[in-house]
């Protein structure tokens, strides 16, 4: 049998498979790594369903579970703090398999972050700041899917949309965050289509434009630790 397997690559050892959780059909995906590479997070099949995991060389792959209230599991880890002690992702709540963003710590386990008001219940965490205190992702809201920034002090706060992106079906999604949590990147509806953005508290959401030659579309996936370099994709004249 064969299946998708999470891996760790280093210059010394090349690509090394991380295995999978036990009990389910073999499948694992790595989606985040700590600052020094010692902690890897992702999701894998287990005996109860798809489950978020945290991997270390000492303890191998350990499932993080899900929200209580349902015998089955459907959770995934998407990001991890620099020291590997805080993991963020999405799980199924006891509210009828509705997705909720979570923040996991060794001390507190999985804690739900709620969602923005006004829409059907849904939220998803995609990235976390270096110290684990700021979480970003997307949530349903009264106006449509919307990127958010979460802290323990403020809770979940929507970041809005780019100018011209409010109608008829607005959306914005956050995908990356700088080390100190001050810069957030993602993509949003705009007057011409979908546009990558960079958000700061001072400037708000600022569109990054697109590559020339194709339909108007750009998407920011991640940002450097200092917030100055952003990567993603755009449609261009080459395809």
Task: Kindly give the residue locations of the regions a language model identified.
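Residue-level hotspots at or immediately adjacent to binding/recognition sites across diverse folds
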Residues: 1-239
